[in-house]
């Protein structure tokens, strides 16, 4: 009986000892994990904030780098365009200088009209000493790059009379005036009408084609198929006027 009481006493003492040993650790564990958890959360939040901050800064730096790159590209393009513009203008300047030098060298020899042609203002004249019909005379002038004489003013008429007659006076010369039918109006080759005081003298011709010629300071009408000398007119070289 005494041994059983001792055994029973031992059995009750063991649980009491284990409980007294476990309780301190159980009371300490929750507080430590809370601190660790809080610290971990703070670290995570800090890392997340740092990551977001660095991401924003990286994006800003990347945008700035791209802007700088685009600006450099634009500047390079503008520099290339400026260089090309300068090169072109340099070439143009050299070309102008060369043209000016050629003009200065040839200025003393510049003649506004071909050899043997007579100049009056912006026109050159030449009296051909071969006979042609009016139409053939017109074609011959076209081959020379000009047209039959067209008299637009009394002053031009006076010049022609004074100049041409000194060389070949007394001849009949076709000019570029014709009549539109036996009783029609008179026209120059360019379609304009002669001045009223420069109309050819009407000879009451019955020919189907009537043209005008110059003789003794007067315009006279005649059959276009008759043969006469003719006078051509062309524009003077503009650079020599």
Swiss-Prot record:
GO molecular function: carbohydrate binding
GO biological process: positive regulation of cytokine production; receptor-mediated endocytosis
Organism of origin: Rattus norvegicus
Residue ranges annotated for the C-type lectin domain, each copy included: 120-233
Protein name: C-type lectin domain family 9 member A
InterPro entries linked to this entry: C-type_lectin-like, C-type_lectin-like/link_sf, CLEC9A, CTDL_fold, NKR-like_CTLD
Chain location of the short sequence motif ITAM-like per the record: 5-10
Localization per Swiss-Prot or TrEMBL: Membrane
Self-association state and partner proteins as the record states: Homodimer.
Taxonomic superkingdom: Eukaryota
PTM comment text: N-glycosylated.
Side of membrane Cytoplasmic, spans: 1-34
Function: Functions as an endocytic receptor on a small subset of myeloid cells specialized for the uptake and processing of material from dead cells. Recognizes filamentous form of actin in association with particular actin-binding domains of cytoskeletal proteins, including spectrin, exposed when cell membranes are damaged, and mediate the cross-presentation of dead-cell associated antigens in a Syk-dependent manner.
Gene3D superfamilies assigned to the protein according to its UniProt record, in alphabetical order: Mannose-Binding Protein A, subunit A (3.10.100.10)
Cellular component annotations (GO), alphabetically ordered: cell surface; membrane
Positions on the Extracellular side per record topology: 56-241
């Amino acid at each position: 009986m005494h041994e059983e009481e001792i055994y029973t006493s031992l059995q009750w003492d063991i649980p009491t000892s284990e409980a007294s040993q476990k309780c301190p650790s159980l009371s300490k564990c929750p507080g430590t994990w809370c601190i660790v958890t809080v610290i971990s959360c703070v670290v995570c939040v800090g890392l997340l904030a740092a990551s977001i901050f660095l991401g924003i800064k990286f994006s800003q730096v990347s945008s700035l780098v791209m802007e700088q790159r685009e600006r450099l590209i634009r500047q390079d393009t503008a520099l290339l365009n400026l260089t090309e513009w300068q090169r072109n203008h340099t070439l143009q300047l050299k070309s102008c200088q060369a043209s000016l030098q050629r003009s200065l060298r040839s200025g003393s020899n510049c003649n506004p009209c071909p050899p043997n042609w007579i100049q009056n203002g912006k026109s050159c004249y030449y009296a051909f000493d071969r006979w042609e019909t009016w139409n053939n005379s017109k074609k011959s002038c076209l081959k020379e790059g000009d047209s039959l004489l067209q008299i637009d003013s009394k002053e031009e008429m006076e010049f022609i009379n004074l100049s041409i007659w000194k060389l070949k006076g007394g001849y009949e010369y076709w000019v570029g005036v014709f009549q539109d039918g036996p009783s029609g109006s008179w026209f120059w080759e360019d379609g304009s009408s002669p001045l009223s005081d420069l109309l050819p003298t009407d000879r009451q011709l019955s020919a189907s084609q009537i043209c005008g010629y110059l003789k003794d300071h007067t315009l006279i009408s005649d059959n276009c198929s008759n043969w006469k000398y003719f006078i051509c007119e062309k524009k003077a070289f503009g650079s020599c006027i």
